[in-house]
A protein has these predicted regions:
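Aromatic- and glycine-enriched beta-alpha-beta binding-site module
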Residues: 22-57, 66
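Short, surface-exposed beta-strand/loop "edge" segments at domain boundaries and coil↔beta transitions
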Residues: 26-33, 70-74, 121-127
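Terminal, regulation- and interaction-focused segments at domain boundaries
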Residues: 9-27
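Short, flexible, solvent-exposed loop/turn segments with mixed acidic/basic and small polar residues
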Residues: 5-14, 99-110
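Well-ordered beta-strand positions enriched in small/hydrophobic/aromatic, beta-favoring residues
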Residues: 20-22, 64, 115
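Surface-exposed, low-hydrophobicity interaction/linker segments
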Residues: 51-98
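Glycine-rich, aromatic-bearing surface loops/beta-hairpins
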Residues: 110-158
């Protein structure tokens, strides 16, 4: 199996996007998407998951996508936490199964979800977010503070 490596620069156009982090009381991705769709007039749909392989373990992150016609931009909602993976130990320990979860962007591990967009959303969206009771916190994220290898996790298949 051949492995290829890409060298990125933070100024690469592929990293030209806005990122908003959400900390929510809603832990299930589909419930959170339903909540955003209902309260923010979005129409997110589930698309292929983001898969990251690390040390032979495949971690899966949910992705939802929506095309906002008004501004002609693609908006993606990405889970910051993978689905739990059950790892079976073969070293005869007392605990032979371990549940592992990977964080997509460890620099912002306090956010459950990320909203990735081509450009800034309108002010009405942010005002609406402030009134949503099930969102504890949301912040625009400076992607310059994210390590390149973690930024690569946000390059999603189209």
């Amino acid at each position: 199996l051949k492995t290829y490596s890409l060298d990125w620069d933070i100024d690469d156009p592929i990293f030209n996007f806005n990122l908003l982090g959400f900390n929510s009381y809603i832990s299930k991705d589909y419930d959170f998407v339903f909540y955003l769709n209902k309260n923010c007039n979005f129409n997110f749909k589930r698309v292929n998951d983001q898969q990251i392989i690390e040390n032979g373990i495949t971690y899966v992150f949910s992705i939802f996508r929506f095309f906002l016609e008004k501004t002609e931009q693609k908006i993606e909602l990405i889970s910051n936490f993978s689905y739990p993976q059950i790892i079976i130990n073969d070293n005869n320990s007392f605990f032979d199964k371990i549940e592992k979860v990977k964080i997509l962007i460890p620099e912002y591990n306090y956010f459950n979800y990320f909203l990735k967009s081509d450009s800034l959303l309108d002010d009405e969206f942010y005002i609406n977010l402030e009134n949503l009771k099930k969102i504890c916190k949301f912040n625009k994220i400076n992607i310059d503070k994210i390590k390149i290898k973690n930024l690569e996790n946000l390059i999603l298949p189209t």
